[in-house]
């Protein structure tokens, strides 16, 4: 899914959907398009880094104790617990990007995306939010993608598929639903939405 928050000094684009649906690949291709003026908002997580993940680029990797301190200090727009790990979106990261007159790109799982919607609803800015939920062509393909990633156990994959089924039921909470049949076609669909919704792009 993708949520775009329209703000005078920049936009927030949130990509969301089940794990393994291709959010990371879509995000990478969007960031390559300089016309979109996108900057990736690096989230905080308590999970261990995967192979080739870089501190400060893919995530800020913190211990559970450090994450808890950030919660107490109200540093997050949203945070959630997923597969026994914490994930959170830092207010400071979003503000820094918007302050530099860029649009913010946030790739986030569904619970976090819904929490962001709640956050901006409280700020009476819900009309400025555009959401896009990325769907898999089939659940079987989603399972294959996660399996090919090689970073989860069979039990973790079962949990992810079960969670994906629940997340897909929430798709109507987002303004747009896109199916990622073919990566480049899906990216073009996202870009077309951005061009329609953000007139200056």
Swiss-Prot record:
<comment type="similarity">
    <text>Belongs to the guanylate kinase family.</text>
</comment>
<dbReference type="GO" id="GO:0005524">
    <property type="term" value="F:ATP binding"/>
</dbReference>
<keyword id="KW-0418">Kinase</keyword>
<dbReference type="InterPro" id="IPR027417">
    <property type="entry name" value="P-loop_NTPase"/>
</dbReference>
<dbReference type="InterPro" id="IPR008145">
    <property type="entry name" value="GK/Ca_channel_bsu"/>
</dbReference>
<feature type="domain" description="Guanylate kinase-like">
    <location>
        <begin position="10"/>
        <end position="195"/>
    </location>
</feature>
<dbReference type="Pfam" id="PF00625">
    <property type="entry name" value="Guanylate_kin"/>
</dbReference>
<dbReference type="InterPro" id="IPR020590">
    <property type="entry name" value="Guanylate_kinase_CS"/>
</dbReference>
<keyword id="KW-0547">Nucleotide-binding</keyword>
<dbReference type="GO" id="GO:0004385">
    <property type="term" value="F:guanylate kinase activity"/>
</dbReference>
<dbReference type="InterPro" id="IPR017665">
    <property type="entry name" value="Guanylate_kinase"/>
</dbReference>
<keyword id="KW-0963">Cytoplasm</keyword>
<dbReference type="InterPro" id="IPR008144">
    <property type="entry name" value="Guanylate_kin-like_dom"/>
</dbReference>
<dbReference type="GO" id="GO:0005829">
    <property type="term" value="C:cytosol"/>
</dbReference>
<keyword id="KW-0067">ATP-binding</keyword>
<keyword id="KW-0808">Transferase</keyword>
<comment type="function">
    <text>Essential for recycling GMP and indirectly, cGMP.</text>
</comment>
<protein>
    <recommendedName>
        <fullName>Guanylate kinase</fullName>
        <ecNumber>2.7.4.8</ecNumber>
    </recommendedName>
</protein>
<feature type="binding site">
    <location>
        <begin position="17"/>
        <end position="24"/>
    </location>
    <ligand>
        <name>ATP</name>
    </ligand>
</feature>
């Amino acid at each position: 899914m993708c949520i775009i928050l329209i703000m005078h000094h920049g936009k927030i684009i949130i990509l969301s959907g089940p794990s393994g649906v291709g959010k990371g690949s879509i995000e990478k291709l969007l960031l390559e398009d300089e016309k979109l003026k996108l900057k990736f908002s690096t989230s905080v997580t308590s999970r261990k880094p995967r192979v080739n993940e870089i501190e400060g680029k893919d995530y800020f990797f913190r211990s559970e104790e450090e994450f808890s301190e950030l919660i107490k200090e109200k540093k997050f727009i949203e945070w959630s617990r997923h597969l026994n790990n914490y994930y959170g979106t830092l207010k400071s990261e979003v503000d820094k990007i918007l302050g530099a007159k860029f649009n913010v790109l946030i790739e986030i799982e569904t619970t976090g995306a819904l929490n962001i919607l709640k956050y901006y609803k409280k700020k009476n800015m819900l009309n400025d939010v555009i959401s896009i939920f990325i769907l898999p062509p089939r659940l079987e393909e989603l399972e294959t993608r996660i399996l090919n990633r090689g970073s989860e156990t069979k039990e973790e994959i079962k949990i992810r598929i079960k969670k994906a089924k629940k997340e897909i039921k929430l798709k109507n909470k987002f303004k747009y639903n896109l199916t990622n049949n073919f990566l480049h076609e899906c990216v073009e669909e996202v870009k077309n939405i951005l061009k329609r919704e953000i007139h200056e792009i």
